[in-house]
Amino acid sequence: MVERSHRPHLNPHRHTKKEERKIKKAFEKYYERYGWYGVYEELKRKGYKRSFSGMVYAAKRMGLKEKRTKKSPRKQARRYPELLMPGEKVQIDVKEVPYNCLRGDALKYGRRFYQWTAIDECTRYRFVYAFEEHTPENTVKFLKMLLKEFPFKIQKIQTDNGTEFTYKYISDNEISPLDKVLQALKIPHILIPPRTPWHNGKVERSHRNDQRYFYNWETFKTLDELNEKLKKHLEWSNNKIMRTLGMKSPVQLLAEKLAA
């Protein structure tokens, strides 16, 4: 007689039916807006103990897959050395709030809202706030708020060459309001080369994520409503795990860095 295999027919580490039901429920509720990381965070809140990759593998085995979209090939981005300490360099940029998010008086009176964003290059920890006018004065207001919000000293600030940040390309003599404040604080202001937004890649990427996870889903009647919703979104994004941070959130990495 031929000896039969003694190997188990089922993987002992395979997800249980109960775990699979939880994955399916979380996927249906959170994937479309928040992606795999949103699904994983929800499962962890419900006591799920397995790894992120294990969850994705199980979900795909169950037939839960993302919709594939054709992506145009991208040039290989230049890699820059990762910074080691919070505050070594903070990127700042402005995003115009999409017009199709406006409702009520904001839409009726043709208002425009603008989101200022600061992101710490080391930890990806962010601060955001919206204003109604795209002006240098609002950049200074944002900076003053930022200095109170970030729990570490900012050593350098990097921006593009927009007039809300610098007058370098429009005046040989006049200094922008932001530069006046930064000079008084002895914080260097780094300007990226003209027409090279990839040099501010981290804040640009964060704006794309804001579009995907926030603006594609929300509407606003007033500036106050926008800032209230932005506050909740900011808390979520600062606590969202990131593969680039070793499956940690900006809040987790920041706490580790400050405790070291």
At which residue positions do the language-model features occur?
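C-terminal domain-tail junction helix/linker
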Residues: 185-187, 208-260
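An active-site-proximal beta-strand-loop segment
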Residues: 92-127, 137
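Short, well-ordered secondary-structure micro-motifs
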Residues: 102, 167-170
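Active-site beta-loop-alpha junctions of metal-dependent nucleic acid enzymes
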Residues: 109-112, 128-156
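Mobile genetic element proteins and their domesticated derivatives, centered on retroelements
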Residues: 23-26, 39, 55, 93, ...
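RNase H-like two-metal-ion nuclease catalytic core shared by retroviral integrases
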Residues: 159-161, 169-212, 231-232, 253-254
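Basic, flexible linker segments flanking DNA-binding modules
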Residues: 1-98, 163, 173-182, 254-258
